Design a protein with these regions (language model features):
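Secondary-structure boundary elements
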Residues: 8-77
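Cysteine-centered nucleophilic/redox motifs
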Residues: 78-103, 121
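General N-terminal targeting signals
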Residues: 54-57, 67, 86, 117, ...
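Short amphipathic alpha-helical patches
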Residues: 63-64, 93, 116-117
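Short active-site-adjacent helix-start/loop capping segments
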Residues: 58-61, 91, 110-112
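His-Asp-centered catalytic microenvironments across diverse enzyme cores
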Residues: 2-19, 23-24, 28, 49-50, ...
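Residue-level marker of positions within ordered structural domains that often coincide
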Residues: 45, 87, 126
Length: 167
Protein backbone atom coordinates (compact mmCIF):
# COMPACT_ATOMS: atom_id res chain seq x y z
CA UNK A 1 0.00 0.00 0.00
CA UNK A 2 2.80 2.41 0.84
CA UNK A 3 4.38 1.80 -2.59
CA UNK A 4 1.20 2.96 -4.32
CA UNK A 5 1.27 6.28 -2.49
CA UNK A 6 5.00 6.66 -3.08
CA UNK A 7 4.47 6.21 -6.84
CA UNK A 8 1.49 8.58 -6.97
CA UNK A 9 3.21 11.37 -5.08
CA UNK A 10 6.82 10.93 -6.18
CA UNK A 11 8.38 14.31 -6.96
CA UNK A 12 9.92 15.05 -10.34
CA UNK A 13 13.69 14.72 -10.46
CA UNK A 14 15.75 17.70 -11.57
CA UNK A 15 16.28 16.05 -14.99
CA UNK A 16 12.54 15.32 -15.35
CA UNK A 17 11.73 18.92 -14.43
CA UNK A 18 14.12 20.25 -17.08
CA UNK A 19 12.68 17.90 -19.74
CA UNK A 20 9.15 18.93 -18.80
CA UNK A 21 10.14 22.60 -19.20
CA UNK A 22 11.59 21.81 -22.65
CA UNK A 23 8.34 20.02 -23.54
CA UNK A 24 6.28 23.11 -22.74
CA UNK A 25 8.83 25.60 -24.06
CA UNK A 26 9.49 27.43 -20.79
CA UNK A 27 12.94 28.98 -20.40
CA UNK A 28 12.26 31.60 -17.72
CA UNK A 29 13.30 31.92 -14.11
CA UNK A 30 12.56 29.27 -11.50
CA UNK A 31 10.75 31.40 -8.91
CA UNK A 32 7.46 30.74 -7.14
CA UNK A 33 5.66 33.94 -8.17
CA UNK A 34 2.25 34.64 -9.68
CA UNK A 35 3.95 35.90 -12.86
CA UNK A 36 5.95 32.69 -13.27
CA UNK A 37 2.83 30.61 -12.56
CA UNK A 38 0.95 32.49 -15.29
CA UNK A 39 3.80 31.95 -17.75
CA UNK A 40 4.04 28.22 -16.92
CA UNK A 41 0.28 27.87 -17.44
CA UNK A 42 0.45 29.69 -20.78
CA UNK A 43 3.34 27.51 -21.97
CA UNK A 44 1.48 24.37 -20.90
CA UNK A 45 -1.72 25.42 -22.70
CA UNK A 46 0.21 26.07 -25.90
CA UNK A 47 2.15 22.79 -25.81
CA UNK A 48 0.12 20.03 -24.17
CA UNK A 49 -3.36 19.21 -25.48
CA UNK A 50 -6.37 18.08 -23.52
CA UNK A 51 -7.19 14.55 -24.66
CA UNK A 52 -9.21 11.74 -23.19
CA UNK A 53 -8.47 9.03 -25.75
CA UNK A 54 -7.13 6.55 -23.20
CA UNK A 55 -10.24 6.89 -21.06
CA UNK A 56 -12.54 5.91 -23.92
CA UNK A 57 -10.43 3.76 -26.24
CA UNK A 58 -7.61 2.10 -24.31
CA UNK A 59 -9.96 0.07 -22.09
CA UNK A 60 -7.50 0.13 -19.22
CA UNK A 61 -7.31 1.71 -15.80
CA UNK A 62 -5.45 5.02 -15.97
CA UNK A 63 -2.09 5.02 -14.20
CA UNK A 64 -1.78 8.31 -12.35
CA UNK A 65 1.68 7.67 -10.93
CA UNK A 66 4.21 10.43 -11.49
CA UNK A 67 6.38 8.16 -13.64
CA UNK A 68 3.47 7.12 -15.88
CA UNK A 69 2.23 10.70 -16.31
CA UNK A 70 5.75 11.88 -17.07
CA UNK A 71 6.23 9.17 -19.71
CA UNK A 72 2.89 9.89 -21.38
CA UNK A 73 3.00 13.70 -21.38
CA UNK A 74 6.71 14.51 -21.57
CA UNK A 75 8.43 11.51 -23.16
CA UNK A 76 5.63 10.45 -25.53
CA UNK A 77 4.48 14.05 -26.14
CA UNK A 78 0.82 13.22 -25.58
CA UNK A 79 -1.88 15.13 -23.78
CA UNK A 80 -4.26 13.97 -21.11
CA UNK A 81 -7.32 14.80 -19.08
CA UNK A 82 -7.62 16.71 -15.80
CA UNK A 83 -6.20 14.11 -13.41
CA UNK A 84 -3.22 13.56 -15.72
CA UNK A 85 -2.45 17.13 -16.82
CA UNK A 86 -3.09 18.82 -13.49
CA UNK A 87 -1.49 15.88 -11.68
CA UNK A 88 1.83 16.27 -13.47
CA UNK A 89 1.64 20.08 -13.51
CA UNK A 90 1.25 19.97 -9.71
CA UNK A 91 4.62 18.20 -9.49
CA UNK A 92 6.20 20.80 -11.77
CA UNK A 93 4.88 23.60 -9.57
CA UNK A 94 6.23 21.90 -6.45
CA UNK A 95 9.63 21.56 -8.16
CA UNK A 96 9.55 25.36 -8.56
CA UNK A 97 8.83 25.76 -4.85
CA UNK A 98 5.13 26.61 -5.11
CA UNK A 99 2.87 25.70 -2.20
CA UNK A 100 0.03 23.91 -3.95
CA UNK A 101 -2.55 21.17 -3.57
CA UNK A 102 -4.85 19.22 -5.86
CA UNK A 103 -8.56 19.68 -5.22
CA UNK A 104 -11.73 18.13 -6.55
CA UNK A 105 -14.12 20.42 -8.37
CA UNK A 106 -17.37 20.22 -10.23
CA UNK A 107 -18.37 21.77 -13.49
CA UNK A 108 -21.77 23.42 -13.31
CA UNK A 109 -23.80 23.71 -16.48
CA UNK A 110 -27.08 25.50 -15.95
CA UNK A 111 -29.06 24.16 -13.02
CA UNK A 112 -27.57 20.66 -13.07
CA UNK A 113 -25.29 20.01 -10.08
CA UNK A 114 -22.93 17.20 -11.03
CA UNK A 115 -20.75 15.34 -8.52
CA UNK A 116 -17.14 16.51 -8.14
CA UNK A 117 -15.37 14.82 -11.04
CA UNK A 118 -12.67 17.29 -12.01
CA UNK A 119 -9.21 17.95 -10.57
CA UNK A 120 -7.84 21.47 -10.21
CA UNK A 121 -4.86 23.00 -8.44
CA UNK A 122 -4.93 25.60 -5.67
CA UNK A 123 -1.68 27.55 -5.35
CA UNK A 124 -0.90 29.70 -2.30
CA UNK A 125 1.08 32.87 -3.01
CA UNK A 126 1.42 35.79 -0.61
CA UNK A 127 -1.43 34.50 1.55
CA UNK A 128 -3.82 34.25 -1.40
CA UNK A 129 -5.35 31.09 -2.85
CA UNK A 130 -5.10 31.01 -6.64
CA UNK A 131 -7.08 28.75 -8.98
CA UNK A 132 -5.00 26.97 -11.60
CA UNK A 133 -6.33 24.48 -14.15
CA UNK A 134 -4.37 23.21 -17.16
CA UNK A 135 -6.50 20.08 -17.55
CA UNK A 136 -9.99 21.05 -18.68
CA UNK A 137 -11.26 20.44 -22.18
CA UNK A 138 -13.24 23.66 -22.24
CA UNK A 139 -12.84 27.32 -21.36
CA UNK A 140 -10.78 27.95 -18.23
CA UNK A 141 -8.95 30.99 -16.95
CA UNK A 142 -5.68 31.15 -18.93
CA UNK A 143 -3.82 32.50 -15.90
CA UNK A 144 -4.16 32.14 -12.13
CA UNK A 145 -7.31 33.63 -10.62
CA UNK A 146 -7.67 34.47 -6.95
CA UNK A 147 -10.31 32.33 -5.27
CA UNK A 148 -12.87 34.63 -3.71
CA UNK A 149 -16.09 32.72 -3.01
CA UNK A 150 -19.34 33.97 -4.47
CA UNK A 151 -17.65 36.81 -6.32
CA UNK A 152 -17.49 37.01 -10.10
CA UNK A 153 -13.92 37.14 -11.42
CA UNK A 154 -12.86 38.05 -14.94
CA UNK A 155 -9.96 36.53 -16.81
CA UNK A 156 -9.29 36.99 -20.51
CA UNK A 157 -12.78 38.38 -21.12
CA UNK A 158 -14.61 35.48 -19.45
CA UNK A 159 -16.40 35.43 -16.14
CA UNK A 160 -15.90 32.83 -13.41
CA UNK A 161 -17.34 32.33 -9.95
CA UNK A 162 -16.10 30.09 -7.17
CA UNK A 163 -18.39 28.59 -4.54
CA UNK A 164 -17.65 26.61 -1.40
CA UNK A 165 -19.94 23.83 -2.61
CA UNK A 166 -23.00 24.81 -0.60
CA UNK A 167 -26.37 24.87 -2.29
Amino acid sequence: MNDIFSALYAPLSKAQTEEYLLRIGYSGVHHATKEVLAELMQCHFMSVPFENLDVYYAHKEPDLSTASLYDKIVKNRRGGYCFELNGLFLHLLRAFGFSCTARQARIIKGEFLSPPSHEVIVVKIDGKSLFCDVGFGGPVPPSPVEIICDSVQESDGRRYMFSDGGE
